Amino acid sequence: MQFILYIIGQYLYYHINNLSLQLISLFLGYFFCTIICSIPKETGDWGLITALLIVGINETMSALIYSYKKYENNIIVKTINGIKIGIIYGLFVDSFKLGS
């Protein structure tokens, strides 16, 4: 019985740590997007060019990472993917703020 509880505890510990790492990377990506989009706005009207560069870099990274099947379950790749999702989410939120 104790062994079963130990296995369940280890399973939950791994998944809770994985979930917290994914949430932190998502919020970090959102924070990066806020920083990246705020700096060019102060110096001029560079919003469209900044968004174009961010999406271009994001798609290039995705093409490089997902071209190899051995990197699909790597924790670093999952963290980078969470940061990329946070950056794209930040772009959507920023565009809705500008539209209202």
Curated annotation (Swiss-Prot):
InterPro entries for this protein: Uncharacterised_Ycf20 (IPR007572)
Naturally occurring in which organism (per UniProt): Aglaothamnion neglectum (Red alga)
Name the UniProt record assigns to this protein: Uncharacterized protein ycf20
GO CC term, one of those recorded: chloroplast
Subcellular location, principal: plastid
Subcellular location: Plastid, Chloroplast
PANTHER family assigned to the protein according to its UniProt record, in alphabetical order: PTHR33787, YCF20-LIKE PROTEIN (PTHR33787:SF5)
Family: Belongs to the ycf20 family.
Gene designation per UniProt: ycf20
Keyword terms: Chloroplast, Plastid
